[in-house]
Amino acid sequence: MGHTDVVPVNRDGWSVDPFAGERRDGFVWGRGAIDMLNQTAAMAAVFKRFASGEHRYPGDLVFLAVADEEAGGKLGARWLVEDHWAWVSTDYLLTEIGTPALAGRRGMGIPVTVAEKGPQWRRLHTRGAPGHGSQPYATSNALVPMAAAVAALGANPPGAHITEEWRRFVEGWDPPGDLAADLLDPDRIDAAIDRLAFDDIGLARWVHACTHMTVSPNTLHGGVKVNVVADRADAEIDVRSLPGQDETDVRDHFRKAIGPAFDEIEYEVVEATKANGSAPAGPLWEALTSAISEVAPGRHLIPAMIPVGTDARFFRRRGTVAYGVGLFEDRVGFGDFLRMFHGHDERVSEVSLSMTADLFLRTVERLGEQV
């Protein structure tokens, strides 16, 4: 399963037309190149080979290309799972995300998405009364309490929390020196993240997001005109919860961060999905392990939790084992790759497209030998 929709762009930050699909220096450039048109294209190419009879699978093989993952999946994967399960019912699922390899003391490891944090999107609303902007004395300006609330959320981030999913990832990665121990200690991990940021800000952001509930105020709207006192303000906050956390934990954090003013703000739950995952064991995991040994000898799998949400969560609710994986050459490192997600100059190498398609093909073939 892949998605075909992409997020908007700011063209000023791009060195190419973000929607031209330009091929340059061995890369395909454009919005969605790694999120996730690369994997979707590889899946389509592999599915064609099975559909044409060139390769065979002893069961049903379904290819899904959905168009609203970036908007929450309500009209795509969620609709298919909830309203048309008979069409898409599956025991195993391959989807996003795939990343380049990570170097550790065990060698190069391929992160495989086996779990993901929970999207817990929130909206805050404040109300005031309109008036002339030239006479603000004793007015009720909705922007003022909203600005204070957003600032409080930014100034009071949640602390580190080490989950079993994170321990499993660090053990599989096995980074050099004392880094592994630092990354598993809630009292030392923030300092370790700061050190990582000097050399690799993309990796540092990943580590931080995988070990903290994250709270990111990303939109703020209020008022209608510069000379009118704002009678309404609205903010949207992207919250991502860790395994074991739920709606109550999110609300408790907002209340603690904002303080008594929280009770004067309208708090809206937009999305409330818990973290979810699949065990890194069983036929699909074994098929992936075999496929990697064939197409990337000497590399091993690292079960990873990702800080983003994917459409896999809808299938996992039905008991489907869902993983995200890809295979990439080493021209772009793990951290630099992550920085391109929803960023400028997104691109994927043509060699990586071929490698990912080969991995998918071998994985399906090896799974077919087991089921």
Regions found by a protein language model. Give the residues of each.
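Acidic/His- and Gly-rich active-site-bordering loop/insert found
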Residues: M1-R31, T40, S52-G59
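Short pre-catalytic strand/loop immediately N-terminal to key active-site residues, enriched for Gly-Thr
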Residues: R24-D35, L301-I302, H344
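Acidic/histidine-rich catalytic neighborhood of metal-dependent amide-processing enzymes
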Residues: F27-V28, I34-P111
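Short glycine/serine- and small hydrophobic-enriched flexible loop segments
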Residues: A45-S52, A148-A152, V239, R362-E365
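Acidic-enriched catalytic cores of C-N bond-cleaving enzymes acting on peptides and small amides
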Residues: W85-W87, D91-Y92, G98-G107, V112-W121, ...
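Active-site-adjacent substrate-binding region
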Residues: V150-P158, D178-L184, A279-E329
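Serine-dependent amide/ester hydrolase catalytic core
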Residues: A233-E247, R251, R255, F262-P307, ...
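Zn-dependent metallopeptidase/amidohydrolase metal-coordination segment
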Residues: A272-K274, G298-G368
